[in-house]
Amino acid sequence: VRTERRLFVVDGPKGLEAALETPGRVREVFVTPAAAERYAALLDVLASTAPDVPVHRVDGPAMEALSEAVTPAGVVAVCTPLDVPLADLLAPRPRLLALCADVRDPGNAGTVVRCADAAGADGVALLGNAVDLHNPKTVRASVGSVFHLPIATETDVAGAVAAVRAVGVRVLAADGGGRLDLFEAEASGLLAEPTAWLLGNEAWGLPDEVAALADDVVSIPIHGRAESLNLATAAALCLYASARAQRAPGA
């Protein structure tokens, strides 16, 4: 469905609820009889806000074929694509972005989107050889956040970083070899400026040539014996540090 018709499937009631916030996003819904009873209030919202969207009753085996969840919730929605052009993401002069370079794991990508949404970021960009934004695991891991903020996809990492810098947003690469650590960056006032965090692949982080595209490189201090932090945790720390700095009195 994703490749042939530029449509994708959203699993579960939370995803459907979030998708309904954008008029025209939901094209059709499939639901089992049991789920129709369990989520009757949500289906009432669907009927009132999008009365032209067809709702198909299906049995358990059909739902298992439609859903990629281990335990299907019994309701899936077919939706229109999410991604926007990078130029549209940058047009409003964003103050906080997450740039994910070559992030391949759909669960991590979805969780970064969720973290960005929670931190009040203005958008996310999936760069390079990144996971498909519409992968069901990406959508599910975001818990609806893919519908809450603009998300761009761009294969040209260098071009995307240059475009972000061109609109006055400072690009900070999150990497263990950073010149500053996160606390020093915040104390210096650096994070109060419009910022895009450049985050690397789960397995090998940011290659030197990609980190070199950023205005500066910032590390997250590790005080214990852990070798590193996973991508989503690092993203949450960086994004929330920027959100705190940007929302401080007088910022």
Language-model features, listed with the residues they occupy:
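Short pre-catalytic strand/loop immediately N-terminal to key active-site residues, enriched for Gly-Thr
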Residues: 6, 100-104, 219-227
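RNA substrate-binding interface of SAM-dependent RNA methyltransferases
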Residues: 14, 21, 61, 79, ...
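Glycine/charged-rich beta-loop-alpha catalytic/anionic-binding loops adjacent to active sites
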Residues: 1, 57, 90-99, 213-222
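Structured adenosyl-cofactor binding patch, chiefly the S-adenosyl-L-methionine
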Residues: 77, 115-119, 133-146, 208-251
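Active-site/ligand-binding-proximal alpha/beta "capping" segment
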Residues: 172-226
